[in-house]
Every structure is written in structure tokens, then in C-alpha cells.
């Protein structure tokens, strides 16, 4: 088939490949693939109307349409076309999985590469970020782990523009659905593990095994896994990887790289650790003990790619916090964080509670997303009641669920603690800011970097950090 595909590309002056009729561009080939929820064959005419020069399908019913070509296996044809059209990748690849911390680690790794004078990029929840050169990528699908075509297209574009190092997030959904196909990485990282996505995986064991596919299916034979030693299931993970002949090293309070002491404040933290029988310490403006682990996972990732350990450590002082990840807004005591799981919310609240002044109060504004894991909602209410002094329950991205019912499920876990329920997220944030007293801390949790709110089918502009800034101008908080 290779010869035929190459001929087709030349004959029709093909400019690109597409599996989504919404993103088809002039001179693209559209591959009509049947997915989990939609069938590309239903959108053939739409793709042609947008400029597709050809459509490839394995559904014989559609070959009566002009410009439609039948093949026995459309997926195989797509993969063959990708190898012809988007063959290049950056020379070194690192993948990061984990319930929480993926976005932070990929950003820290890419930032550090740049600080070491290398051209690097990251792909994940926040999108494509390019360090050391201008931004080259537009129209990125909103998935933590991209579909295989999108990934290869972006990786090829990056390599064509001189990007040497690529680090990306690997979600449990993406791994379970084999979106990465045959992609192999030099380093694979595991940041954290706790309950999430049970609406998809059904059990925590299935969820964990999906994560571990990264190390079994995608790590090069001479590659290394970098694991957070403080994961509750770490012994199972180590045994599982050992049984599959995967080399690994651990980071954490009981790791091969051992975190020995943290001194945290609202301005940042001093991190002390030992590695290879040497003691180290460095300062960072990034807040949170969990971020200490994330930073050091990033350090080992780059070290095992081939960079001198001390050079990597020296660059850490310039690594910046990631948007929406324990992001301190304009030097106030107001933080925006993506914490949307029970574990992430507990860690964020615990960190802020530990660094607040004794007589000050900790407030939290949060909700839960609709059409997602319902089991975590009451747990998050329970955690807020345990860790925060003031609780404000609001809407997150309700999607197609009744937001009032989502809030009720959160509130069911709060039990005896006081709370305030304000459906409108902006009003909830404003209420939280207005009620701050001297030295109080406010955490706005759940949406982090997102610049939208999904209500039904509508995706409305909304940015927690910008709403906080707007409220600060009006409210003049004392924090």
C-alpha cells in the first residue's frame, strides 16, 4: 500500500492528514475512522466540503461518493500515511503519568532544558508549550494525551523546527486507548496515584494498570522509570515493573533520591535532599511539598537523559510555577490551583494550612465537574470540611449534569461543618475574597489554568485567576 499512498500524495498535492472533519483543511486526506462515540463515515461529505482532496474508508457503502477510496483496514492505512507524511520526532522523549502533577512535571522538565540552553517543548493539559524559540503550534486538540495523528503531526513540526527534546503527559485514558501506539520514550515518570476517573476505569486497580502501560509498552529497553516513592501502592508498582524487567529509580521521603527537609512559606520553599551519598539544597519560589517531589522527578529525568546533575540543580532556582498550579495571584494570599481530585485538594489545603499564621483562617472555593467521576464529590466535601476553616461550594464545569445536584453531592460529605453555597462561580470567588481578614488565605480550586467554563453545550470564557484579579481591584483584600 505504501507505493499507492505515496503516489496519491504526489498526484493530489496532499498538504496534510485528518481524522476529524471539523479540522479538515484544504488539500487534506480525510481518514473515515469509526471511534468510540462517532463514526468518521458519517462526516465524509462534511470533510469534502471543507477541502479534503480524498477520503479513505473501509466502509464499502461510501465508495459511490466521488473522491472516496476503499481500503481493507483504514487504521492501518492511516498509520502508514503518518510514517510517510510525519516521520520525524525530537531526538529525546520523556513521558509523564500520574493522577496529579503531570502538567507541573512536564513544564519543569521543558523549562529546565531551556535554562540549560536546549530547545524543548511540552505537550499536555495546558496545550503545547515551546521553550527556547517562538511558539510554532496552533489548533491543538483539548486532550491530555493527544490522538496518535495529532501527536505525530506536532512532533514532526517540532523536529522540523529544531526542537531536540519533547516531554509530554500520558493520561490513563490515552494509555488505555493506545493513543500513543508505538511511541517509545527514553524516560517515563510516575508522579502520584489516587482515586480518579472511576467513571471510565470502574476500579482503582484498572486505573493503576492503565497507568503502568506507559512503562511496559512505551519505555525503551535501555530507558528508566522515575517513580514517586510516596505513592501508596509503590511496592506493588516496583514489583510489577521488576517482573517486566523495567529499570527504575525512586524520588521522595523514602526514595533513592531522598527528600530530607522542607522549609515552606508563602514566598516559596527551601528543599534539602540526598542523592548518591551527597547532600543538596536549593531554594524555589514554587510552593508545596508535592511540588518538591515534582521538581526532583524533573531533575532526575534530565540527569538520566545525559545532563550533569549539578548543572540541573543549579538551574532550578529559575524554574517558575505553572499557570493554575498553586499559583499565587499578584503577591496576595489568594491561590488558584487545578486540584480537582480528593488527593490534590487535600494536598493543596494541607500545604496552605501548614504555612498560614496561627490565628489566620483558610478558605476554599470549589466545585466538581459534571459527567465525570461522581464518587469523588462527597470525598472532596469531606476533605474541605477537615482542612478548611471556610467552605464555599460553587459550580465547576457542570457540562450536562444539573449543577445543583453536583453541589448537593459535594455537600453530602461536609456533614457538620459550615459552608456557603453560591452557584455562580464568579460570585463565589468574590464572596471568598470579600470575607478575607488580615493574613487569611483563600484557595480557588478545581479549574486552574482553564480559561473557560462548560455549561451544557456552551463553552463560556472564564478564568479563575483573572476573576480573582478583577475582584482584587474592586475588593482590595487585606490578605
Swiss-Prot record:
Posttranslational modification: Carboxylation is probably crucial for Mg(2+) binding and, consequently, for the gamma-phosphate positioning of ATP.
Entry's localization field: Cytoplasm
Keywords: ATP-binding, Cell cycle, Cell division, Cell shape, Cell wall biogenesis/degradation, Cytoplasm, Ligase, Magnesium, Nucleotide-binding, Peptidoglycan synthesis
UniProt-recorded Gene Ontology molecular function terms: ATP binding; magnesium ion binding; UDP-N-acetylmuramoylalanyl-D-glutamate-2,6-diaminopimelate ligase activity
HAMAP family in the record: MurE
Record's catalysed reaction(s): UDP-N-acetyl-alpha-D-muramoyl-L-alanyl-D-glutamate + meso-2,6-diaminopimelate + ATP = UDP-N-acetyl-alpha-D-muramoyl-L-alanyl-gamma-D-glutamyl-meso-2,6-diaminopimelate + ADP + phosphate + H(+)
Enzyme Commission numbers on file: 6.3.2.13
Amino-acid positions noted as binding ATP in the UniProt annotation, renumbered to this chain: 98-104
Main location: cytoplasm
InterPro entries found in the cross-reference section: Mur-like_cat_sf, Mur_ligase_C, Mur_ligase_C_dom_sf, Mur_ligase_cen, Mur_ligase_N, MurE/MurF_N, UDP-N-AcMur-Glu-dNH2Pim_ligase
Function noted in UniProt: Catalyzes the addition of meso-diaminopimelic acid to the nucleotide precursor UDP-N-acetylmuramoyl-L-alanyl-D-glutamate (UMAG) in the biosynthesis of bacterial cell-wall peptidoglycan.
Gene3D superfamilies to which the protein is assigned, alphabetical: Mur ligase, C-terminal domain, Mur-like, catalytic domain, MurE/MurF, N-terminal domain
The species this protein was found in: Rickettsia rickettsii
Entry's Gene Ontology cellular component terms: cytoplasm
Name this polypeptide is given: UDP-N-acetylmuramoyl-L-alanyl-D-glutamate--2,6-diaminopimelate ligase
Enzyme class: ligase
Membrane-spanning parts: none
Binding of UDP-N-acetyl-alpha-D-muramoyl-L-alanyl-D-glutamate, residues: 21, 144-145, 171, 177, 179
Positions contributing to meso-2,6-diaminopimelate binding: 372, 396-399, 446, 450
Sequence similarity: Belongs to the MurCDEF family. MurE subfamily.
Modification N6-carboxylysine occurs at: 211
Coiled-coil parts of chain: none
UniProt motif (Meso-diaminopimelate recognition motif) ranges: 396-399
Needed co-factor(s): Mg(2+)
Pathway connected to this protein: Cell wall biogenesis; peptidoglycan biosynthesis
Any one biological process term the GO annotation gives: cell division
Amino acid at each position: 500500500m505504501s507505493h499507492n499512498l505515496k503516489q496519491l500524495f504526489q498526484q493530489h498535492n496532499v498538504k496534510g492528514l485528518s481524522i476529524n472533519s471539523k479540522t479538515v483543511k484544504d488539500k487534506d486526506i480525510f481518514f473515515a475512522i469509526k471511534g468510540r462515540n462517532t463514526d468518521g463515515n458519517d462526516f465524509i461529505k462534511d470533510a469534502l466540503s471543507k477541502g479534503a482532496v480524498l477520503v479513505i474508508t473501509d466502509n464499502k457503502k461510501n465508495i459511490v461518493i466521488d473522491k472516496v477510496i476503499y481500503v481493507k483496514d483504514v487504521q492501518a492505512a492511516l498509520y502508514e500515511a503518518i510514517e510517510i507524511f510525519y516521520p520525524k520526532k525530537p531526538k529525546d522523549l520523556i513521558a509523564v503519568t500520574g493522577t496529579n502533577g503531570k502538567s507541573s512535571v512536564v513544564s519543569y522538565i521543558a523549562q529546565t532544558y531551556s535554562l540549560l540552553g536546549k530547545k524543548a517543548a511540552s505537550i499536555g493539559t495546558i496545550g503545547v508549550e515551546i521553550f527556547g524559540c517562538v511558539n510554532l503550534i496552533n489548533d491543538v486538540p483539548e486532550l491530555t494525551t493527544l490522538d496518535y495523528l495529532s501527536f505525530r503531526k506536532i512532533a514532526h513540526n517540532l523536529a522540523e523546527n529544531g526542537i531536540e527534546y519533547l516531554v509530554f503527559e500520558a493520561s490513563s485514558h490515552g494509555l488505555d486507548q493506545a493513543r500513543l501506539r508505538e511511541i517509545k520514550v527514553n524516560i517515563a515518570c510516575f508522579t502520584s496515584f489516587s482515586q480518579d476517573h472511576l467513571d471510565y476505569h470502574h476500579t482503582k486497580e484498572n486505573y493503576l494498570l492503565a497507568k503502568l502501560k506507559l512503562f511496559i509498552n512505551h519505555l525503551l529497553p535501555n530507558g528508566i522509570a522515575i517513580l514517586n516513592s510516596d505513592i501508596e501502592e509503590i511496592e506493588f508498582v516496583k514489583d510489577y515493573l521488576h517482573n517486566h524487567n523495567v529499570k527504575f529509580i525512586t524520588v521522595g521521603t523514602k526514595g533513592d533520591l531522598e527528600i530530607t527537609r522542607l522549609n515552606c512559606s508563602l514566598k516559596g520553599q527551601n528543599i534539602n535532599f540526598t542523592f548518591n551519598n551527597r547532600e543538596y539544597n536549593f531554594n524555589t519560589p514554587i510552593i508545596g511539598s508535592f511540588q518538591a517531589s515534582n521538581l526532583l522527578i524533573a531533575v532526575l529525568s534530565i540527569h538520566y537523559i545525559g545532563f550533569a546533575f549539578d548543572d540541573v540543580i543549579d538551574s532550578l532556582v529559575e524554574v517558575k510555577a505553572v499557570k493554575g498550579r498553586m499559583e499565587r495571584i499578584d503577591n496576595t494570599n489568594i491561590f488558584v490551583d487545578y486540584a480537582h481530585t480528593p488527593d490534590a485538594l487535600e494536598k493543596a489545603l494541607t500545604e496552605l494550612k501548614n504555612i498560614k499564621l496561627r490565628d489566620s483562617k483558610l478558605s476554599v472555593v470549589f466545585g466538581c465537574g459534571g459527567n465525570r467521576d461522581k464518587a469523588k464529590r462527597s470525598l472532596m466535601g469531606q476533605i474541605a470540611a477537615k482542612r478548611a476553616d471556610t467552605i464555599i461550594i460553587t459550580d465547576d464545569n457542570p457540562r450536562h449534569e444539573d449543577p445543583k445536584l453536583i453541589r448537593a453531592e459535594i455537600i453530602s460529605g461536609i456533614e457538620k461543618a459550615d459552608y456557603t453555597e453560591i452557584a455562580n462561580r464568579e460570585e463565589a470567588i468574590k464572596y471568598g475574597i470579600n470575607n478575607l481578614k488580615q493574613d487569611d488565605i483563600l484557595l480557588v480550586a478545581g479549574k486552574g489554568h482553564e480559561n473557560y467554563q462548560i455549561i451544557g453545550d456552551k463553552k463560556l470564557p472564564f478564568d479563575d485567576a483573572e476573576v480573582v484579579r478583577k475582584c482584587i481591584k474592586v475588593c482590595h483584600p487585606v490578605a
